[in-house]
Structures are given as structure tokens and as C-alpha cells.
């Protein structure tokens, strides 16, 4: 008979010491696993953190271009607005500069001293050879315009003649107040003396136009009226009742014979202004007088244009009435 083999004990009974060792080893194993897992967990968390950080960083990278473009657009808008404002301000400055230049051009002296002498000499020659240039302003303008240093217009020419006559009358009135006759008045500047002498030959007491005006009144009234004693000396702005045509009456009132048709004699009031003592009140009055003179220049220009238009129409009517007769 074969001997009986002992059955292999699958689960042998472990002693208490072994159990304790196994338990301790199990605990150490579990603690090792836990330590390993705990050691691994920071690595996992650290590996996850970049992912978490990368998401907002990725979102930032995607949103950064949007914020930069928006910032660029806002910057461009502000830049455009600033450019528009600067353009508007520059435009306003240009308009102001243009207005200032226009205002300055109104008071710029166009006629030189040589032009004044040429104009007076031409006026004197025309009046001596023919008739009053004021009654034939178109012919006189055509004869003198090429001799002036600039492209003078007809209203400018008429206005300048009126101003020269007004200047002459003012100098004569000042001289009479000082006890000086127009024939003995002397000026330091040669150009002023020349213009005064030419003006005296035209509008003086023995001037061409003054003597012609007296003869014209006698002829128009049939020569039956005696010349008044007051007519022996030149008078300003005298209104004459005669048989002149309507066009000639209008011209004699509004044109060169009556440059101050508004009734304001600048020379008279400027002479009175000289008698006032220097001070704020006098300076204020002088400024007002300059403003009045500037306005008179504008009105004189308008008056000349009005006279030219009305005279043209009335002369045609007068010619038509004479032809019918």
C-alpha cells in the first residue's frame, strides 16, 4: 500500500506573530500605496493646472486681438475726430483771415500820388478842351483809364474825383481860418503842392469848372438873370433851380459836384474836432469820425453805381424826347 500523502494546506494557519507581520506589511503596503498615490496626486494636479491655466490663457489669446482691434478703432475714431476738429478750427481761422483781409482791402490805398496827379491833369485837360467830365463820365473814363497804374473801374474813378474835390475844399477852409487865401497856400511835400495847384485850377475861385458853372447857369436861364454877389466866391453844395434835364439835375446833385450829399462836411467837423483838448473823449470822437468816413466811402461807391445806371436811362429818354421834337 502506498503511503498516504499529506494534504497540502492551502491556507495554513498563521501564527499571531505572522499575522501581525502580515498586517503590518499590509498596512505598510497600503500606506505605501497611499503615499504613492498621494505623491502621484500633486503630479496629476500639476499636470492638470497648466491645462486649466491654458484655457484662460487661450481665451485671452483669442480675445486679445478683439480688444486690440477695438482699441485701434477707438483710437482711429478719436484721431479722426481730432482731425475734423482741427480742420474745422483751421477753416474758421481761414474764414476769419479772409474777412480781415477783405476789411483791410476796403481801406487799402489804390491810387498812388502819381495816379492822383495824372487824374487831376487829365480832368483839367478834358474840362478845358471839352466840357465837365462829370457830364461825360464815360468818355472821360475811356480817355484816362489806361494812364492809371491799376485796372480802375468807373465807380472808383468817380469816387476818387469826389474825394479829391472834398480834400481840396477842406484845405481851403482850413487855410481861410488861418487867414490864408488859396492862392498863397504852400505845402511842404511837392506832390501835395502839385495836387493842390491842379485842384485849384479845376475847382478854385478861378477854376475851369467854377467859371463854366456860372456861365452854364446864365445860358440855361436865357441870360436874363444877374449873377448874385454871393456867386463871386465858390460855394459848396448849392442847389440851383434851372431848366436842366432830369438826368442832368440828378447828376449835379449826386455826382462829383455834391460828394457829401448826406449833408455831413467832414472837413468842417474835423476842424472843430481839432479845437477839443486831447483826452479819451476826443480819441473816441476821432474813431467815430473814421468810421463815418469809411461808411461814406461805401455809400459813395453805391451812389456812383446808382448814378451811372439812372443817368444812362434818363439820357436815353431825353434823346428820345428831343428826337420826337
Curated annotation (Swiss-Prot):
Entry's family note: Belongs to the GeBP family.
Pfam families: GeBP-like_DBD
InterPro entries noted in UniProt: GEBP, GeBP-like_DBD
Highest taxon in the source lineage: Eukaryota
Biased composition (Basic and acidic residues): 73-83
Full protein name: Probable transcription factor At4g01260
Residues annotated as transmembrane: none
Keyword Transcription regulation among record annotations: yes
The entry's keywords: Transcription, Transcription regulation
GO function term, MF aspect, one: transcription cis-regulatory region binding
Species in which this protein is naturally found: Arabidopsis thaliana (Mouse-ear cress)
Region (Disordered): 1-98
Compositionally biased spans, kind Low complexity: 23-32, 49-69
GO biological process, one term: regulation of DNA-templated transcription
Amino acid at each position: 500500500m502506498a503511503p498516504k500523502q499529506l494534504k497540502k494546506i492551502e491556507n495554513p494557519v498563521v501564527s499571531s506573530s505572522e499575522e501581525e507581520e502580515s498586517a503590518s506589511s499590509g498596512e505598510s503596503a497600503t500606506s505605501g500605496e497611499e503615499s504613492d498615490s498621494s505623491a502621484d496626486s500633486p503630479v496629476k494636479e500639476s499636470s492638470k493646472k497648466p491645462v486649466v491655466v491654458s484655457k484662460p490663457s487661450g481665451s485671452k489669446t483669442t480675445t486679445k486681438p478683439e480688444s486690440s482691434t477695438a482699441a485701434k478703432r477707438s483710437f482711429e475714431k478719436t484721431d479722426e475726430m481730432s482731425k475734423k476738429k482741427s480742420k474745422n478750427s483751421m477753416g474758421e481761422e481761414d474764414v476769419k483771415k479772409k474777412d480781415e483781409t477783405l476789411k483791410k482791402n476796403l481801406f487799402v490805398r489804390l491810387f498812388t500820388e502819381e495816379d492822383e496827379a495824372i487824374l487831376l491833369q487829365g480832368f483839367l485837360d478834358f474840362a478845358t478842351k471839352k466840357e465837365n467830365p462829370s457830364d461825360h463820365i464815360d468818355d472821360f473814363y475811356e480817355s484816362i483809364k489806361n494812364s492809371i497804374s491799376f485796372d480802375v473801374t468807373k465807380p472808383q474813378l468817380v469816387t476818387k474825383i469826389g474825394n479829391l474835390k472834398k480834400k481840396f475844399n477842406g484845405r481851403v477852409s482850413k487855410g481861410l481860418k488861418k487867414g490864408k487865401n488859396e492862392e498863397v497856400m504852400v505845402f511842404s511835400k511837392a506832390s501835395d503842392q502839385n495836387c493842390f495847384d491842379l485842384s485849384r485850377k479845376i475847382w478854385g475861385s478861378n477854376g475851369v469848372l467854377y467859371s463854366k458853372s456860372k456861365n452854364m447857369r446864365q445860358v440855361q436861364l436865357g441870360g436874363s438873370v444877374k449873377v448874385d454877389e454871393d456867386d463871386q466866391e465858390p460855394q459848396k453844395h448849392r442847389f440851383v433851380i434851372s431848366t436842366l434835364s432830369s438826368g442832368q439835375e440828378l447828376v449835379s446833385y449826386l455826382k462829383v459836384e455834391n460828394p457829401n450829399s448826406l449833408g455831413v462836411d467832414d472837413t468842417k467837423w474835423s476842424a472843430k474836432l481839432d479845437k477839443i483838448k486831447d483826452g479819451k473823449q476826443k480819441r473816441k470822437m476821432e474813431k467815430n469820425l473814421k468810421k463815418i468816413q469809411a461808411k461814406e466811402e461805401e455809400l459813395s461807391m453805391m451812389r456812383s453805381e446808382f448814378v451811372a445806371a439812372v443817368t444812362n436811362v434818363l439820357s436815353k429818354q431825353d434823346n428820345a424826347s428831343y428826337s420826337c421834337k
